[in-house]
Amino acid sequence: MLIGDIMTRNVHLVRPEETLHYAAGLMAQWDIAFLPVADASGLVGTLTDRDIILRAVAPGLDAGTTKVSDIMTSNITYCYDDEEVDGVLENMKALQLRRLAVLDRQERLAGVVSRTDFTRHGI
């Protein structure tokens, strides 16, 4: 089975210039904890609810003025939609990741895969 068979395809994005307040609002509205960050050139980072808590709330940054780009993870770990699920799951476990951005072979965002996706498919 391939990652493309189990990943979530309709992914919500946030732009790096948006505020954390805006990004957190999207997370609340869509009940998600992970947002890929993209600009006109493509995927430039990721933002999680944990990033917001540890890198913004705990140090007292203002969510209304702090930009997503200020705290996002820009060293992106990802997989491809045509990779086998077993290998990707092993990599996620080794790196202690809950979610991964999924790219197609043209380096475009194709979706997101989470540990929940594996469980939902009995993997």
Language-model segments: which ranges?
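Bateman (tandem CBS) regulatory domains
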Residues: 1-11, 65-76
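Nucleotide phosphate-binding site architecture
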Residues: 4, 12, 21, 53-54, ...
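Amphipathic alpha-helical segments that mediate coupling or scaffolding at interfaces
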Residues: 6, 26, 55-56, 71, ...
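The conserved cystathionine-beta-synthase
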Residues: 13-31, 38, 79-96, 103-104, ...
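A glycine-centered beta-loop-beta connector
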Residues: 27-30, 35-51, 92, 100-116
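A short, polar/charged loop-to-alpha-helix boundary motif
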Residues: 53-66, 118-123
